[in-house]
From Swiss-Prot:
<dbReference type="GO" id="GO:0006040">
    <property type="term" value="P:amino sugar metabolic process"/>
</dbReference>
<keyword id="KW-0119">Carbohydrate metabolism</keyword>
<comment type="pathway">
    <text>Cell wall biogenesis; peptidoglycan recycling.</text>
</comment>
<dbReference type="Pfam" id="PF03702">
    <property type="entry name" value="AnmK"/>
</dbReference>
<protein>
    <recommendedName>
        <fullName>Anhydro-N-acetylmuramic acid kinase</fullName>
        <ecNumber>2.7.1.170</ecNumber>
    </recommendedName>
</protein>
<dbReference type="GO" id="GO:0016301">
    <property type="term" value="F:kinase activity"/>
</dbReference>
<keyword id="KW-0418">Kinase</keyword>
<feature type="binding site">
    <location>
        <begin position="25"/>
        <end position="32"/>
    </location>
    <ligand>
        <name>ATP</name>
    </ligand>
</feature>
<dbReference type="InterPro" id="IPR005338">
    <property type="entry name" value="Anhydro_N_Ac-Mur_kinase"/>
</dbReference>
<keyword id="KW-0808">Transferase</keyword>
<comment type="similarity">
    <text>Belongs to the anhydro-N-acetylmuramic acid kinase family.</text>
</comment>
<dbReference type="GO" id="GO:0005524">
    <property type="term" value="F:ATP binding"/>
</dbReference>
<dbReference type="InterPro" id="IPR043129">
    <property type="entry name" value="ATPase_NBD"/>
</dbReference>
<dbReference type="GO" id="GO:0097175">
    <property type="term" value="P:1,6-anhydro-N-acetyl-beta-muramic acid catabolic process"/>
</dbReference>
<dbReference type="GO" id="GO:0016773">
    <property type="term" value="F:phosphotransferase activity, alcohol group as acceptor"/>
</dbReference>
<comment type="function">
    <text>Catalyzes the specific phosphorylation of 1,6-anhydro-N-acetylmuramic acid (anhMurNAc) with the simultaneous cleavage of the 1,6-anhydro ring, generating MurNAc-6-P. Is required for the utilization of anhMurNAc either imported from the medium or derived from its own cell wall murein, and thus plays a role in cell wall recycling.</text>
</comment>
<keyword id="KW-0067">ATP-binding</keyword>
């Protein structure tokens, strides 16, 4: 037996494993790095987040990614070079974290890397007859493995597509395994660049569980701030939005979109919801001369209404649901206030701290769970193709030499 296979086998047999989860979202804020102690697998999974940090991305990194990110046409040579470069870059960040945490890399069983999404393209979006769903994440896991000396599991989304899914959202697997409850109906709401949710009814019926993208959360607001406000990456404390007024005409135009009418589950991305989308809505509503503050106030409300529509759909199926939110959007208190107002049937809004997981770390933790399932799990019992959930083992293994 090859030593690498033997080591993986021994890791799988251990009662608990140390797994580093990596997540780099479409907001391009930074690399989330979560060191997790994961005990058991499947529905018996238990997690302790030992260390967590977000390593901020430099402007240089963001500039490089934005040259190809969510673009239908880009420089193929540049994209080819970015793939290994991002992997090496992420590997260096992991080494920095291990050094600062004073953790020996030899003690880590595996790294779980999501990579950097460059383009997400479900069939409902591209409309080509000859092709099904597609998604592309860069950041070669071989580069991470070689740079850190740690076996790396990555490229999780491709198996989901191979099994007939859209490659997203994958949160449902970890949410179901770790956050399901027999005491209450739960909605796990992730408020990143794109908002998505996982619906977890308390009856535990896996056929009723689903996960879906909802629509834009931070993606358009952040892009607008970055274009029109120097040296600002997002609307801190919603200060810009609070200084403006909601424009009804623009709000109506923003809400007029085919994706928003589709039933869940569905997926989307910044390929659809971006500044060009906003500009088209402004033109359609003759609101090009609005102040930046009014635009941001309207975008904030638009985001809230899109998310609220999805939450209210869920609560009709499961009364008294409790929402557990995570992601950068939870820090936008104006957005959260809108959600509370628009969702009176929701029993409560909390963040995942209440469930023992830092809301900023949740996605990195979820990919650590997927790696744990790849390594030590059994056949996944969550298999509901009608809801876009394939009962498959995800992840590709990259050895360190």
């Amino acid at each position: 037996m090859h030593p690498h296979i033997s080591k993986l086998y021994n890791s799988a047999l251990k009662p608990s494993r140390l797994i580093i989860g990596l997540m780099s979202g479409t907001s391009l804020d930074g690399l989330d790095v979560a060191l997790c102690k994961i005990t058991a697998a499947g529905v018996h999974t238990q997690i302790e987040v030992l260390k967590f940090t977000t390593v901020d991305y430099s402007d240089d990194y963001k500039t490089k990614i934005k040259q190809v990110f969510a673009k239908r046409e880009c420089n193929l040579e540049y994209l080819t070079l970015l793939h290994p470069w991002v992997g090496k870059f992420h590997g260096d960040m992991v080494n920095q974290c291990l050094n600062s945490w004073q953790v020996n890399p030899a003690n880590i069983d595996v790294i779980a890397s999501h990579g950097q999404t460059i383009y997400h393209c479900p069939k409902s979006q591209h409309q080509y007859n000859d092709f099904n769903n597609g998604t592309l994440q860069i950041g070669d896991s071989d580069q991470i493995a070689v740079t850190t000396g740690i076996t790396t599991i990555g490229d999780f989304r491709q198996k989901h597509i191979a099994a007939g899914g859209e490659g997203a959202p994958l949160a449902v697997y970890g949410d179901y395994l770790f956050f399901s409850s027999s005491d209450e109906n739960r909605i796990l709401l992730n408020m990143g660049g794109i908002a998505n949710l996982t619906f977890l009814p308390q009856n535990g019926d896996s056929n009723a569980v689903f996960s879906s993208d909802i629509g834009p959360c931070n993606t358009i607001m952040d892009a607008y701030v970055q274009r029109y406000f120097n040296n600002m990456h997002y609307d801190e404390n919603a200060a810009i939005a609070k200084a403006g007024f909601i424009n009804t005409a623009l709000l109506t135009a923003l809400c007029d979109n085919h994706f928003l009418t589709l039933k869940m589950p569905k997926t989307t991305g910044p390929e659809v919801f971006n500044l060009a989308y906003l500009e088209a809505a402004q033109q359609a509503s003759n609101t090009q001369k609005l102040s930046h503050q009014d635009v941001m106030a309207t975008l904030n409300r638009f985001t809230a209404e899109v998310i609220a529509n999805a939450l209210n759909t869920c609560v009709k199926m499961a009364p008294n649901s409790v929402v557990y939110a995570s992601g950068g959007g939870i820090h936008n208190l104006l957005l959260m206030q809108h959600l509370v107002t628009l969702c009176p049937a929701i029993k409560g809004f909390k963040n995942t701290h209440a469930l023992g997981v830092d809301p900023d770390a949740k996605e990195a933790v979820l990919f650590a769970i997927l790696a744990n399932e790849c390594l030590a799990g059994e056949q996944l019992h969550l298999d509901n193709k009608a809801q876009g959930i394939a009962g498959v083992t995800m992840g590709k293994v990259s050895f360190a030499d």
